[in-house]
């Protein structure tokens, strides 16, 4: 199994969620986060002055999938999140040793 951790622009979240659901990826954990990468923040005009915002709002999506579903999920996320502009996001793929469903005790390795 793999944990696919994705960080995207908030305005792309509904597109990504819909695309994932259409491909059968329904369970996910969503967290509102702040961060920066290549983008290094933005400069805004505020009350007549310039203000630098170096940590931008992002959405983090976490989903655990079978190894065989990893590439399909990555393609789905990439296609639905991409705008072609700096700050589109990042995908991390992390091995998962096992998962345990708390309600039933069912283990998946």
Which residues does each PLM region occupy?
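Positively charged, small/polar-rich N-terminal and surface patches that mediate targeting and assembly
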Residues: 1-109
């Amino acid at each position: 199994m793999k944990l696919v951790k994705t960080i995207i622009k908030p305005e792309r979240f509904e597109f990504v969620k819909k695309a994932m659901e259409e491909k059968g990826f329904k369970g996910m954990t969503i967290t509102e986060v702040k961060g920066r990468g290549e983008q290094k923040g933005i400069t805004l005009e505020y009350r007549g002055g310039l203000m630098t915002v170096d940590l931008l709002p992002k959405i983090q999506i976490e989903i655990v999938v079978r190894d065989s579903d990893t590439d399909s999920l990555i393609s789905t996320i990439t296609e639905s999140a991409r705008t072609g502009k700096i700050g589109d996001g990042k995908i991390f793929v992390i091995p998962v040793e096992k998962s345990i469903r708390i309600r039933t005790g069912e283990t998946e390795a």
